[in-house]
Amino acid sequence: MKAALLIESLTGNTQKAGDRIANDLQQVGWTITGVSRVKVPDFGSIQDADMIIVGTWVHGLFVVGQAPWGLGAISHLPAMQGKKAAVFCTFALSPGKTLDKLTSTVSLLGAEVIGGLALNRGKIEAHSEEFVTRLVDSVPVQV
């Protein structure tokens, strides 16, 4: 499976998670076509990928009004018809409905979103590993 990662990070936590996810996917035999910022996407890596992984951070007022940062930029990514996608967000206190909003936005680009996970910034490594495990388990093995 070939995957492209599109990341929006403010403090580095989401980038750290994305890098960990890319590394873990490579360890199980996936090819990473590129890791780029949502606002400066690598169009070639998106085109070459079977799976698009979109990650961003949660913004909001403590435990109310949470939303994925950069939804506008995400909604302007290129069309992803025929591609599968997975989403993740990093959060401090509560992700709220961030994954639902992120899933909806990526789905509108034409991708089939097969899952997502909210990663607590205090547990980036463990939650990134869980994300990869769930993602790999949800994708049929290609022969």
Residue spans of the language-model regions?
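FMN-binding flavodoxin-like domain, especially the glycine-rich phosphate-binding loop
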Residues: 13-16, 22-35, 48-143
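Extreme N-terminal starter segment of soluble prokaryotic enzymes
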Residues: 1-4
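Short acidic loop-to-helix transition motifs that present clustered carboxylates
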Residues: 36-41
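Short hydrophobic segments within beta-strands
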Residues: 6-8, 88
